[in-house]
Amino acid sequence: MKIYFLIYDKVEELDLVGSWELIGLLAEKGLCEKPKLISLNSMTPSGEHGMRFSADYHFTDPVQPDVLFVPGGSGARIAMEDIDVINYLKKTAENCHSVLSICTGMYLMQKAGLFKHKKVTTHWAFLEHLKKDNTVTVVE
């Protein structure tokens, strides 16, 4: 199973690294391939607090994950205005087993329409944003 993480400038490091740790443990047990990073901008984006990452792929590369994690960070609110990024998420989600957001990664998924008619939640500070979307059921 291919499990990839979307990264971008100003990604929240904890959202990315915490989940990466769990998937890495699964990979060590042979339950999935080693996780990979797909960048939305440069191949070496910086996180919210300055941590640098080295991407395995750019979102324009022809790769298809089985599972895609979309971590949060202030950069998500910038990336959600890029139509190419939104189209990438829509197209990739069609062939994914699962697409998961962490915290404000939900901005990207919501903009791509991936939450329609689903139950969703996020960090309490961002619930009001989700509640404005009448196509989703917000779980607190």
Residues covered by each model-derived region:
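Anionic-ligand binding patches
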Residues: 120
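Short loop-to-alpha-helix "cap/lid" segments that border enzyme active sites
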Residues: 132-134
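Class I SAM-dependent methyltransferase SAM-binding "motif I" and its flanking Rossmann-like core
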Residues: 124
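Extended, subdomain-level signal for the structured scaffold at the beginning of enzyme domains
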Residues: 1-99, 106-110, 117, 128, ...
